[in-house]
UniProtKB/Swiss-Prot annotation:
Protein origin, superkingdom: Eukaryota
Originating organism: Danio rerio (Zebrafish)
Location, primary (coarse class): endoplasmic reticulum
UniProt name for this protein: E3 ubiquitin-protein ligase RNFT1
TM region positions: 141-161, 187-207, 217-237, 240-260, 270-290, 303-323
Catalyzed reactions: S-ubiquitinyl-[E2 ubiquitin-conjugating enzyme]-L-cysteine + [acceptor protein]-L-lysine = [E2 ubiquitin-conjugating enzyme]-L-cysteine + N(6)-ubiquitinyl-[acceptor protein]-L-lysine
One GO MF term: zinc ion binding
The protein's role, per its UniProt record: E3 ubiquitin-protein ligase that acts in the endoplasmic reticulum (ER)-associated degradation (ERAD) pathway, which targets misfolded proteins that accumulate in the endoplasmic reticulum (ER) for ubiquitination and subsequent proteasome-mediated degradation. Protects cells from ER stress-induced apoptosis.
Region feature Disordered, mapped onto this chain: 1-120
Zinc finger RING-type: from-to: 359-397
Cellular component terms per the entry's GO annotation: endoplasmic reticulum; endoplasmic reticulum membrane
């Protein structure tokens, strides 16, 4: 009995050791071949089976073989769950595919637009670089060509610069003298008139062979009307001389003594002279350009003459439209010139004493004080001079008039009428 008990304890210890070793190696491993069926079978080791109740008799007969235990439900339930899981996977896959496809389409369109914009910007940059490279290579020739043109037309360019400089100087001087009002210098005004006259006569004398003075009276100058540059030259000189003539009229207005003409009336004369001068400058180049458009060489056919007449008629239509626009401005100027201009009402002595007896503009005693709608008092000449360029009160910015006559300050338009 002692020997049998020792033998049983030894056998139990060996089986326990082997069970621990098998347990570390995961005794319940599914067989790969069994995954192809509807169920799942596990392979149990003999040692694990020996510990199970009721397995004592079978353990002695099948000691060296594994036991397979099927796990899972019936084939119907297994197929149902498999189909359900497959449908869920298919639905989720289709949803993710659709969502991913929409996002991919948006990303593709955005990337296409960005690629197009980047391509356009790169092409424009490359064109700009090509242009700069071409200018860099052609710069020496451009300088040589400009030098040749300057030498060839040195006299004409010098006259053009002189006429423009004279115009800017006299125009600024006239505005300064108008602003000075009573403090203007008659000697300086006379000098401006003499300077304008001498400049005009010098130009006519220098180019006396072309008879440019005839263009002032819409007559034909002795120039080649087939040459575009000569016609353009005649138009430019005529325009500057006309500006000088009307600026001379403004100098004559400046020389009129103050008792004979008020400042407000002077401003109306300046405005009328400028409007008439601009209208005359629009009409003056018409004969020159008309003859240039209808002129033809002996080699030209009747088609060339017909085309020239058609172009001349189109030019006349354009000039008539321009004159129609200027006629409205001239009518407004004439109405302003012949209508009395009143700014405010005469101020009472009490209002003058309350204001302090000093004009806020000229900082001197009031001369013909006028009270505005805002109850501020100014000299009549001072407020008239202010309202030539502004519409509001100098102190409170209340709107006094809705008209601004910009030519009342003696300025002359710098626009060069070349057509």
């Amino acid at each position: 009995m002692k020997l049998r008990a020792q033998f049983d304890r030894g056998t139990y210890s060996e089986s326990k050791g082997s069970f621990k070793l098998r347990d570390s190696l995961d005794p319940m491993q599914p067989e790969p071949s069994s995954r192809e069926g509807n169920g799942l079978s596990l392979t149990l080791q003999p040692e694990l089976l020996a510990r199970m109740p009721g397995a004592g008799s079978s353990s002695g007969t099948e000691t060296g073989e594994d036991v397979r235990v099927p796990m899972g439900s019936s084939s119907g339930s297994t197929n149902g769950r498999g189909a359900t899981s497959r449908r869920m996977r298919t639905a989720s896959h289709s949803h993710s595919h659709t969502h991913g496809h929409g996002h991919s389409h948006e990303h593709e369109s955005d990337s296409g637009e960005s690629d197009l914009e980047s391509g356009e910007s790169s092409s424009s940059i490359s064109e700009l670089r090509y242009l700069l490279r071409w200018l860099k290579k052609s710069l020496p020739f451009i300088v040589i060509l400009c030098a040749k043109l300057v030498i060839q037309h040195a006299l004409g360019l010098a006259v053009a610069v002189g006429l423009f400089t004279t115009f800017m100087y006299v125009n600024k001087s006239i505005q300064t003298q108008v602003f000075l009002h009573d403090r203007r210098t008659n000697l300086h005004c006379a000098w401006l008139l003499l300077f304008l006259t001498s400049s005009s006569l010098l130009v006519f004398y220098t180019f006396h062979t072309q008879s440019l003075y005839r263009c002032l009276f819409f007559a034909n100058a002795t120039i080649d009307y087939h040459n575009f540059w000569e016609v353009l030259w005649s138009v430019g000189v005529t325009n500057f001389i006309l500006k000088f003539i009307f600026m001379g009229f403004k100098c004559l207005i400046l020389l009129v003594p103050c008792p004979l003409m008020t400042y407000r009336r002077r401003g109306q004369w300046y405005m009328l002279i400028e409007e008439v001068g601009q209208l005359y400058q629009v009409i003056a180049p018409v004969p020159l350009w008309f003859r240039y458009l209808v002129s033809y060489d002996e080699m030209d056919t009747s088609v060339g003459l017909t085309l020239g007449i058609l172009l001349a008629l189109l030019y006349l239509i354009m000039k008539l439209l321009a004159l129609y626009g200027l006629s409205g401005s001239l009518q407004k100027t004439l109405r302003t010139f012949f209508s009395p201009e009143v700014n405010g009402a005469p101020a009472s002595p009490a209002q003058i004493r309350e204001a302090g007896d000093i004009c806020p503009i000229c900082q001197a005693d009031f001369k013909q004080p006028r009270v505005l709608v805002c109850q501020h008092i100014f000299c009549e000449e001072c407020i008239a001079q202010w309202l030539n360029q502004e519409r509001t009160c100098p102190l409170c910015r209340t709107v006094i008039t809705d008209k601004v006559h910009k030519w009342k300050d003696g300025a002359t338009s710098a626009h060069l009428q070349i057509y």
